[in-house]
Amino acid sequence: MDITAILHMHAELSLTAVFILMFLLDLFLPATQRHWLRPMACILLTIQLLANLWPEEVTLFGGMYHSTPMASVLKSILTIGTILVFLQADTWLKREDTRHKQGEFYILTLSTLLGMYFMVSAGHFLLFFLGLELATVPMACLVAFDKYKGHSAEAGAKFILSALFSSGIFLYGISMIYGTAGTLYFEDIPAGLTGTPLQVLALVFFFSGLAFKLSLVPFHLWTADTYQGAPTTVSAYLSVISKGAAAFALMIILMKVFGPMTEQWSEILCIIIVATITIANLFAIRQNNLKRFMAFSSISQAGYIMLAVLAGTPQDMASLVYYIVVYIAANLAVFGVISTIEQHTHGKIEREDYNGLYKTNPKLTMVMTLALFSLAGIPPFAGFFSKFFVFMAAFHSGYYLIVFIALVNTIISLYYYLLIVKAMFITPNEDPIGNFRTATPMRISLLVCVAGIFVLGIISGVYQLLSDTAIL
């Protein structure tokens, strides 16, 4: 193979260049100039994003690497979400105990993003696993970023144990696939799949490994502890970017690799979806800590995301992508408000702390309310349309009962989302959170998220554009 063919991996190469530049800046910038790290990270990542807006279909290394226009769209979505997270991290990283670790945060985050790029463009299970681990190992460091705080260290330990267990299960499933199909190339595996018991077991192990990354029930047990203990900005990144990449990868592999076994994995997925949405909703109602609340909300949203996967056609990839784009905007808006209030109040993240928030911080309250309405699926916000497209995709595929159960759970979710809205607007507070000015980078991030919640709901052409690009 001509070595110049590697240059066609321009998304990965340009992101690697950003990684190296950030590493050098972190290494050589004096302490008095380290405040330039965040703007440089955002600028470099934006340039990288713009440089990859003209995608092409590329197959390299005999099919081990395969990038399509849709894969480029997915990478762009993950990159935009990462830029928003960088903006939200600004105030947190300026604290005295984290100021000296700014460079580490950006380098670790870029490492996880590079791993997700490889997951999305993998055409071979070996490359996919390398991307998965590249996305997971730095994430463990991010979860334990505040390592001298007990909750963060505990969250990091639990994340590492979950990651090790899920990786082991995933590898075991891959080994079974290789033993029965004789190859690990995505294009060649379907020809060797006949639905034997060993292949079904391999499918179960593969799915279980990725289910940990998506926090699907029953693989969710330490998710709430991880979200609560991790820094809020890291929890935001974990809930949307990491989960979005895993969902993209899962659908691509189920369509490309396990297409001949659709009957088997669709049955598994039906059970997982019902359990995930229902159990997560029941636990979310009981939560007072907003980070634990958002953890169970994230688990529930993962169940809705799986509805698009269940639909099982490449065309339904559009509903999955649209849902995740909207989910990124709404979830980052909520976590942005939580992070802002947490930084200015030295850790207030309980629901009762938000009582009467509208009287002292009306703008943050409105951002939080709009985002929660979108997550709940209330029209005319984008969350309503994202749920509608996902439900219609599953309905047209004949999963009527699953759609009905999901609709019932959507109604249940209104209760716990509106509990927070009620607290902010109606419930009195003798010691309310004081008024404060939100940092400019956070305001930019929240403005983009709110604009996304409105614009993605109003402009239906976004969904049509994704439908036209949805080629796995």
From Swiss-Prot:
<feature type="transmembrane region" description="Helical">
    <location>
        <begin position="43"/>
        <end position="63"/>
    </location>
</feature>
<dbReference type="InterPro" id="IPR010096">
    <property type="entry name" value="NADH-Q_OxRdtase_suN/2"/>
</dbReference>
<feature type="transmembrane region" description="Helical">
    <location>
        <begin position="11"/>
        <end position="31"/>
    </location>
</feature>
<keyword id="KW-0520">NAD</keyword>
<protein>
    <recommendedName>
        <fullName>NADH-quinone oxidoreductase subunit N</fullName>
        <ecNumber>7.1.1.-</ecNumber>
    </recommendedName>
</protein>
<comment type="function">
    <text>NDH-1 shuttles electrons from NADH, via FMN and iron-sulfur (Fe-S) centers, to quinones in the respiratory chain. The immediate electron acceptor for the enzyme in this species is believed to be a menaquinone. Couples the redox reaction to proton translocation (for every two electrons transferred, four hydrogen ions are translocated across the cytoplasmic membrane), and thus conserves the redox energy in a proton gradient.</text>
</comment>
<comment type="subunit">
    <text>NDH-1 is composed of 14 different subunits. Subunits NuoA, H, J, K, L, M, N constitute the membrane sector of the complex.</text>
</comment>
<feature type="transmembrane region" description="Helical">
    <location>
        <begin position="265"/>
        <end position="285"/>
    </location>
</feature>
<keyword id="KW-1278">Translocase</keyword>
<feature type="transmembrane region" description="Helical">
    <location>
        <begin position="293"/>
        <end position="313"/>
    </location>
</feature>
<dbReference type="GO" id="GO:0048038">
    <property type="term" value="F:quinone binding"/>
</dbReference>
<keyword id="KW-0997">Cell inner membrane</keyword>
<keyword id="KW-1003">Cell membrane</keyword>
<feature type="transmembrane region" description="Helical">
    <location>
        <begin position="446"/>
        <end position="466"/>
    </location>
</feature>
<feature type="transmembrane region" description="Helical">
    <location>
        <begin position="401"/>
        <end position="421"/>
    </location>
</feature>
<feature type="transmembrane region" description="Helical">
    <location>
        <begin position="200"/>
        <end position="220"/>
    </location>
</feature>
<keyword id="KW-0874">Quinone</keyword>
<dbReference type="GO" id="GO:0008137">
    <property type="term" value="F:NADH dehydrogenase (ubiquinone) activity"/>
</dbReference>
<feature type="transmembrane region" description="Helical">
    <location>
        <begin position="318"/>
        <end position="338"/>
    </location>
</feature>
<feature type="transmembrane region" description="Helical">
    <location>
        <begin position="362"/>
        <end position="384"/>
    </location>
</feature>
<keyword id="KW-0472">Membrane</keyword>
<keyword id="KW-0812">Transmembrane</keyword>
<feature type="transmembrane region" description="Helical">
    <location>
        <begin position="103"/>
        <end position="123"/>
    </location>
</feature>
<keyword id="KW-0813">Transport</keyword>
<keyword id="KW-1133">Transmembrane helix</keyword>
<comment type="similarity">
    <text>Belongs to the complex I subunit 2 family.</text>
</comment>
<dbReference type="InterPro" id="IPR001750">
    <property type="entry name" value="ND/Mrp_TM"/>
</dbReference>
<feature type="transmembrane region" description="Helical">
    <location>
        <begin position="125"/>
        <end position="145"/>
    </location>
</feature>
<feature type="transmembrane region" description="Helical">
    <location>
        <begin position="234"/>
        <end position="254"/>
    </location>
</feature>
<dbReference type="GO" id="GO:0042773">
    <property type="term" value="P:ATP synthesis coupled electron transport"/>
</dbReference>
<dbReference type="Pfam" id="PF00361">
    <property type="entry name" value="Proton_antipo_M"/>
</dbReference>
<dbReference type="GO" id="GO:0050136">
    <property type="term" value="F:NADH:ubiquinone reductase (non-electrogenic) activity"/>
</dbReference>
<feature type="transmembrane region" description="Helical">
    <location>
        <begin position="67"/>
        <end position="87"/>
    </location>
</feature>
<feature type="transmembrane region" description="Helical">
    <location>
        <begin position="159"/>
        <end position="179"/>
    </location>
</feature>
<dbReference type="GO" id="GO:0005886">
    <property type="term" value="C:plasma membrane"/>
</dbReference>
